[in-house]
Swiss-Prot record:
Keyword Secreted included in the entry's annotation: yes
PROSITE patterns: B302_SPRY
A biological process term (GO) from this entry: killing of cells of another organism
Species the sequence originates in: Synanceia verrucosa
Protein name from the UniProt record: Neoverrucotoxin subunit alpha
Length: 703
């Protein structure tokens, strides 16, 4: 082949008279075929000033090549790694990281001057060197068009697949406005509110032949930079760079030169394009999976995807290296195009085939989707994600954790035979081992409707437990992934006092409140309380971080005025308004009323209306020295017989949804039911206390 060639410079430092090897797409710097005098004598220049902008809406290699004016032959050389690009051409290497990500590129192109070598072949003497004698070059540069390119690459955040096209269209509409925005006006002023919102969430990456003081990273930056580009080429285009070059076969000037024997056919170029485009697409899917927020919290699956990503990256480099090795040989006529076809065919028959890798990623993506469906149910609760068994052990062994419930993804596997097959194939492509590990969606737990449904049911059960014990100080809640073949999908582990009690937890059915005998059964619901300083009466003192209260006859406390303060009775509420199921214990002595009240209870009335137990918004159990124990509501009171008079520890269990408030005498790990109020609570209730009456003193400690 002896035709002239025209190609984009792609940021490479071309000069007139420079030699070029089209077989290897290699510049040969440091030598000119013509001497300086000859170049000066036959060089001509023509002004060719122009500028244009273009929107590139696709991130495909084909679209990028078109934007850079790259023909098929040079394109396959770039894909094969033969061409090292620079300047604006680095845009070719900028690919989307994620599949579900919208990308729109704004291209600005300006040309300044065209220089050419005008001497006809055979009329000038050429300089011979070892380069020309050994046939290391095929062409010589005889024309260069100067100018500059700039590419503003705008990316959205990851979006849902269903919104991708909509976001893409809106991005194109906004970015098309950039060249029309006046330099005096702010970009935001000339956009609609919806467009402003969209533009503010776009990131920008700049690739250009212009020397900028700072690179644009936002839409606003891009608008400002775009307006300044025409001024950055300098006077008479002094800062312009080679954009397009014209090459003439070296044989026209030097008869002993080698020729480019054959070029790669367009159909073969397309197949190579397709193959590499498939690889990049699969890589983006892996990126998307690996960077998922949930995946990063689960080392079992993250490490597996990361391992695949590294293996696949190595394979891509291997394919590119093979293409780079074969292209010069095919162009020189040493090998046929079949050697390139073999690379494509070998991949199709290998574990790295598009079908195999796509199926494996499909399983991974489905697995992630199922995990997220369950994790999404737990999100927003107080459950904590832990990454592995060691971290889980550290949490369940914490001093304040009596019980721990852990929602465990049990079917996330650490080892994947397919990854071993891929790794082995990279080491030994001719090996036939591993055929049985071809990926498949059959018999995968994440594709089983039964398994997924059961996982969601368990996740809902777990969430119910979290909500039931939301304020419990004794129960910790965790989520993790631990491989366990006994359970498909997920299970709930129960740890008690730091030890695993069961891997398939079912909360014991609640007995009637009178049926509780063991204190440990109620401690599931134990909550932390503190006295509210804004409600406490001035004749009651507080200490021990607001957990101990005592009546102080004749000792007025210096509390500031507050509208919530009880003025007439030695009463105090706790800070915590409670709904749900809660249990707390107090250590009491003397005259003490213990119960709950609505926040609306009167604070100022100098009569029984503001006394707890003497109205319709409070319920109490009382210890009255020399008289015994009573339960009191709305001024009605009844004496209660207790098994051990003088007991010092009282337990209170609130089942707000069920409308019950129960009191227990506590001794070691046993409780004895004393009384239960039944009602319908209509608002949160606050633990309430009255300490001392007349000459009787009273103290309460929150345990």
């Amino acid at each position: 082949m002896s035709s002239d060639l025209v190609m984009p410079a792609l940021g490479r430092p071309f000069t007139l008279g420079m030699l070029y090897d089209t077989r290897r797409e290699k510049l040969i710097p440091g030598f000119s075929l013509f001497g300086d005098e000859t170049l000066q004598q036959y060089q001509s220049s023509n002004t060719q000033r122009s500028s244009e902008f273009k929107i590139v809406a696709s991130d495909s290699t084909e679209s990028k090549s078109s934007a850079m004016d790259i023909e098929a032959s040079l394109g396959v050389s770039f894909l094969g790694g033969l061409v090292e690009v620079g300047g604006s051409a680095k845009y070719l290497n900028n690919t989307k990281k994620y599949q579900n990500q919208s990308r729109v590129t704004l291209k600005y192109k300006a040309t300044t001057i065209y220089k050419q070598f005008t001497a006809p072949p055979g009329t000038v003497k050429v300089q011979e060197t070892v380069i020309t004698q050994r046939g290391l070059a095929t062409h010589v540069v005889t024309g260069i068009l100067y100018g500059a390119n700039a590419f503003f690459v705008f990316d959205s955040d990851k979006v849902e697949d269903t919104n991708l096209q909509d976001i893409q269209g809106k991005m194109e509409a906004v970015i098309k406005k950039i060249p029309t925005i006046s330099i005096e006006g702010s970009a935001s002023v000339q956009l609609t509110d919806e467009e402003k919102s969209l533009a503010s969430n776009l990131s920008c990456k700049f690739h250009g032949d212009f020397l900028l003081e700072s690179l644009p990273t936002t839409f606003e930056d891009a608008v400002t930079t775009y307006q300044t580009l025409p001024t950055l080429l300098g006077e008479d285009g002094a800062s312009a760079v080679p954009m397009k070059v014209w090459l003439v076969p070296l044989k026209k000037f030097f008869s002993k030169a080698k020729l480019l024997t054959q070029e790669i056919t367009v159909s073969k170029v397309r197949r190579i394009h397709t193959t590499l485009e498939e690889l990049y697409k699969l890589k983006r899917r892996a990126n998307e999976a690996m960077d998922d927020k949930l995946v990063q919290q689960i080392p079992l699956i993250h490490d597996k995807i990361s391992n695949f990503h590294q293996i696949f990256q190595d394979y891509m480099l291997t394919v590119q290296k093979k293409i780079a090795e074969k292209l010069p040989l095919v162009r020189a006529g040493t090998e046929s195009e079949q050697s390139l076809q073999k690379i494509i065919d070998d991949r199709a028959k290998s574990p790295f085939s598009n079908e195999n890798v796509s199926t494996w990623l499909e399983v991974i993506e489905r697995e992630i989707a199922v995990l997220k469906s369950c994790a999404g149910m737990v999100e927003g609760t107080q459950a904590k994600f832990v990454s592995n068994q060691t971290e889980l052990d550290r949490e369940v062994l914490a001093e304040d954790v009596k019980h721990a419930l852990c929602f465990v993804f049990t079917s996330v596997e650490r080892n994947d035979p397919y990854l071993k097959v891929l790794s082995d194939y990279l080491e030994s492509p001719d090996s036939k081992d591993g055929k049985e590990a071809v990926p498949s969606t059959e018999d995968k737990w994440c594709f089983s409707t039964r398994v997924v449904l059961k996982m969601k049911q368990r996740a809902q059960t777990f969430c119910d437990h979290v909500n039931d014990f939301e304020k419990s100080r004794n129960v910790g809640f965790f989520v993790t992934a631990l491989e366990n073949g006994k359970f498909q999908g997920a299970s709930i582990y129960h740890y008690k006092d730091g030890s695993l009690a069961t891997q398939d937890f079912t909360f014991p059915r609640m007995p009637f409140v009178q049926g509780y005998k063991k204190r440990s059964d109620l401690l599931w619901y134990a909550c932390d309380l503190t006295f509210d300083r804004n409600t406490i009466n001035i004749w009651v003192s507080l200490s021990d971080n607001d957990t101990f209260a005592a009546s102080e006859h004749g000792k007025r406390q210096n509390y500031p005025k507050h509208p919530e303060r009880f003025l007439c009775y030695n009463q105090v509420l706790c800070n915590e308004g409670l709904t749900g199921k809660h249990y707390w214990e107090v250590e009491w002595n003397g005259y003490v009323d213990v119960g709950v009240a609505y926040i609306s209870i009167s604070r100022k009335e100098d009569n029984w209306v503001s006394a707890i137990g003497h109205n319709t918004c409070s319920w109490v159990f009382s210890s009255i020295p020399r008289a015994g124990y009573v339960e009191r509501y709305n001024q009605r009171q009844y004496y209660v017989t207790v098994p051990t008079p003088g007991f010092k520890q009282l337990g209170v269990f609130l089942n707000w949804p069920d409308g019950s408030l129960s009191f227990y005498a506590v001794s070691s790990d046993e409780v004895h039911h004393l009384h239960t109020f039944k009602t319908k609570f209509t608002e949160p209730v606050y633990p309430a206390f009255c300490l001392g009456y007349r000459f009787d003193h009273g103290t309460v400690r929150l345990l």
